[in-house]
Structures are given as structure tokens and as C-alpha cells.
Amino acid sequence: MSLKAMVFIDGGWLYRSRTTLFQKLGEENGFEIDYAKLPRVLCDDIANYLDEDVSLVRTNYFGTIPSARSGFNTAKQYSFYEFLEKNCGYETEIHEVDVGGNIDRSDDSWTKISLTSSLLYYAAMPGALDVAVVIGDDPDLAPALNRARLFGKRIQPVGLRPMQNAKPESSLFGLPRVCDFPPVYLDDHAADVRLVREIRTRVCKLCGREEETTWAGPDFFCTQCRGKHRSNS
């Protein structure tokens, strides 16, 4: 019988980690994460280590989005979260946050609380999971990971290779009792999780015109209709 694995993704951490993935491949532009492939790559890594079958039963993504009163057009972000749900099979938990006029300002506390609450909920549910894969190596997650291990669950944090002279406690991997497997660094898997886009012909949702595109999301709008769609969103 295969082990059940759930993936818990800190969306803010993953977004900020893209620069490291760019550098790993020697590129500054053109890198995108294959979100559909990402959970499976990490589960396969665990399966190879244990020499056991590992079944991915659920992928949970936690993130934030500027609130309506912040005055930012968030249509693109909502489309991204919809893409994760419809095309990648993710379960998303997204919180509206007042960014105070600064789109780059982030409040990680929402994401951390949501992720750890969900992790402990499933850890306490009999038969829900055997292994929790946590994408994000924030040391603030350590108490929740310790608690999940008390329920008999095995934990696999996924982080980035530490910078030179970094303090051990700046990452989950430097803390005791939070990991049941060798460290997994996302930058080591950069080539594996890189999205390779295929050119295909799609029909515009507004005008019905066919156009070649690499967009794989649920709704497609041609070059002429794209601006109209964004202005109406």
C-alpha cells in the first residue's frame, strides 16, 4: 500500500524564490515554474529515497492578494489562482490583505497561519496523510512541524540552499525535530520544475478568432481582445 503525501505550499515564499531559480539555470528572464509538475517531482524524490510508492493525495497552496480597497487591479492574480485550481488540481486558500498602497508589501503571517492550521488539521485526521511536504523553509513553521510529527506524520521541508555564512537557525533545516528526510533544495530541482511552454492554436473566448499561443490557462483571449478583457475585469 502506497504512502499518502500532501503538499503544503507557502505561495509568498515560492514567489520570492524565483530569483534563485533563475540564477541556478544561468538565466534572468524566461523562467516559469511548472506548477502541475512541482508536487509530483517532490513526491518522486521521497519515493526514491524510501524505495516505496508515494501517492500525491492533495496539494494545498496558501497565498495573499491585495484587497479591493487597496486600489490595485488583481485580475491577473485571480486568474493565476484559478489556473492552479482548474489546471493543476490545487486547493487554494487566498487571503485579501490591505497592502497600504504598496503592491510589493507582503504580510506573511496570513500565509503561515493558514498553512500550519491546515497541516495540523490533516495531521490529526486519521488516514488523511503519511507524509507532509512543506514548500517553504521559514523557521517560524517549526513548532507546527514538531506537532505534526507527534501525530506520527513524516515531514519533508523544501527550501533553498543556504547562502554562504548564513546562520543555521535562519532555515528550517538548521533546527532539530522538523525533518524526517534528507534536505530537499528546490534550486537542485530547478531544471525539473521549469515550465516548457508548447505553442498551440486556441480560440478567443470573446471573438472566436483562432490564434497561436503558449497560454495554457482555462480562458484564452486573442491579442485584440486581451486589453478589453483586462479593462473590464
Give the label of every model feature segment.
Residues 10, 228-233:
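Extended, helix-rich structural scaffolds rather than catalytic motifs
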